[in-house]
Amino acid sequence: MTRKYFGTDGIRGTVGQPPITPDFVLRLAHAVGRVLRRVESRPTVLIGKDTRISGYMLESALESGFNSAGVDVVLLGPLPTPGVAYLTRAQRASLGVVISASHNAYPDNGIKFFSAQGTKLSDEWELAVEAALEEPPVWVDSATLGKARRLDDAAGRYIEFCKSTFAHDLTLKGLKIVVDGAHGAAYHIAPKVFHELGAEVIAIGCAPDGLNINHEVGATHPEALITAVKANQADYGIALDGDADRLQMVDADGRLFNGDEVLFLMVSERLARGEKVPGTVGTLMTNMAVELALKSRGVEFVRAKVGDRYVLEELEKRGWLLGGEGSGHLLALDKHTTGDGLISALQVLQACVRSGKTIAQLLGDVVLFPQTLVNVRLKPGQDWKASEKLALETKAVEAELGDTGRLLIRASGTEPLLRVMVEARDARQAKACAERVADTVRS
């Protein structure tokens, strides 16, 4: 059954346009409340948000919808998505709700949910909510209405949780770190985490005004971080996105490290400590250099579909702990139930402090392969999968690339585009092969 409202990461859109309107969000919360009350007589839901101006409006709508269904609400205020996941589990709540559109600009917003265990919810649960949305509301009587209260120390509890994932025998003393909070949910949290572990912290992107979230700052705009690291002669730079589940890092030279490289470092740090890492999960877009480097160290590597929920599914299926995406969504399931930019950064810094090496030194000879991505607009009705010419060209390119390169062809989920990605040790070869395949699609 196809979902009508839920996407790969909750419900998202432009504020004021369906479904991100106050009336729909109220009905959504009421429907979720009814689903919760099928298994629990008096559920409690936690609600956190990022710093978008629309968060106030949507928070009020959610609160009203839940209360009208007989569900109690605990308001957390601005808090990173992984912080909501953690507190949902720690507070023994029935459900966690996040109001955020992650790395998008302020006109967008969204609603996503976490289970009582702090994990993403199943497709079946989302379908049950959508079915409840189609039914007329059933308002509870006045004596059964839910109540709302605030958890005043939500940020402090999450800060302590993040710090607890860093080795207790280590500190960040002597390090100067630039922290970019993307004017988002971690603006009042991220600087404190690193400062309380001993670092000298320079904060940028930590002055939200409701409209500037992700604007020319944060993980999707690392130029600001690179400039600040160089200007302040810092040792490291850490950039989060609007809801702080995504990470990009920079070293003292201004070199940017993406999620693929950070994943490799997280695995390597554990191997160096003598831990067993049977395997890790990346995505279809994970750089092949990382795959080869991990395999050379005896670590199995599996690719999931693009999206952190698919990485998580593969990890849980195989009983593994570490996975992630090049975009900076990283999972360490023995540290947290979901991707967490702050905890991922702490794992990298722990590796650097313990070894006395920089990120670049820890990566050693692992150099990402050049990637070429070409977007080809499809003609109306064009069935690229049935093209014999494309099948032959694909086979020829894959033969040319051999074991040190790869070709990935996938359709866009939102536009009539075919994405052709080629990865190879040689940038010119990658570009030439990608153009050959793209030209075949166009012909």
Curated annotation (Swiss-Prot):
PTM annotation: Activated by phosphorylation.
Gene Ontology biological process: carbohydrate metabolic process; peptidoglycan biosynthetic process; UDP-N-acetylglucosamine biosynthetic process
Cofactor: how and how many bound: Binds 1 Mg(2+) ion per subunit.
Names of required cofactors: Mg(2+)
Active site: S102 (phosphoserine intermediate)
Reaction equations catalysed: alpha-D-glucosamine 1-phosphate = D-glucosamine 6-phosphate
Residues modified as Phosphoserine: S102
EC number(s) stated in the UniProt entry for this protein: 5.4.2.10
UniProt-recorded Gene Ontology molecular function terms: magnesium ion binding; phosphoglucosamine mutase activity; phosphomannomutase activity
Binding-site residues for Mg(2+), renumbered to this chain: S102, D241, D243, D245
One Gene Ontology cellular component annotation held by this UniProt entry: cytosol
Keywords (A to Z) from UniProt: Isomerase, Magnesium, Metal-binding, Phosphoprotein
Family of the protein in this entry: Belongs to the phosphohexose mutase family.
Function: Catalyzes the conversion of glucosamine-6-phosphate to glucosamine-1-phosphate.
Protein name (Swiss-Prot/TrEMBL): Phosphoglucosamine mutase
Species of the source: Polaromonas sp. (strain JS666 / ATCC BAA-500)
